[in-house]
Amino acid sequence: MVVGMQKKVLTEQALYFGDVSMPKDWEIDQNDLAHHILHSSLTNKKLQFSKTWDKLNTYMREHIGLEYGIQLINKETWGNIYKPTETTIPLLNINPVDLRNSPDYTLLYGVRVDNCFVKIHYDDNRHKGRSWDIPLLNNRFIMFPSTNMYYLINNQKDSLNFVQTITYESF
């Protein structure tokens, strides 16, 4: 029998973000990743496997697993190129009528970015339609539940921004 006041957390919505801190001589080759994103965009084909992408993906899966106990399985991956001053339409990486086969997490990685922000929308109980802005920087990641709508804002006027997206299922 439990006596006194109790608390049970029914749901939690966590965002993970930070640097991709690879060991010396194993750093992510930003130019190689940008090249693959550009090639995929120009040929209108899926992003091809590369050692650089594999290093990034392995790092993320292993570190999220070790730090937070979340085991990740790849669902999909693609790269995007954003024009200067471009703001995307609201993005959602789930299929609302097929949640069972939708990803659990979305990861955004700054391949070659300058003055780029991600606006992530969320609800906080009865406080609906809230959002959080976080800068997306070179060699940094942002990972959040795929049920969150988001969009990217490219604030600068001089260059393209390259962003790698990976979606994951957790188990």
Regions found by a protein language model. Give the residues of each.
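Generic serine detector
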Residues: 21, 40-41, 50, 102, ...
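Catalytic core of non-heme Fe(II) oxygenases with the double-stranded beta-helix
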Residues: 73, 78-155, 160-162
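Non-heme Fe(II)/2-oxoglutarate
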Residues: 1-78, 88
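Double-stranded beta-helix
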Residues: 165-171
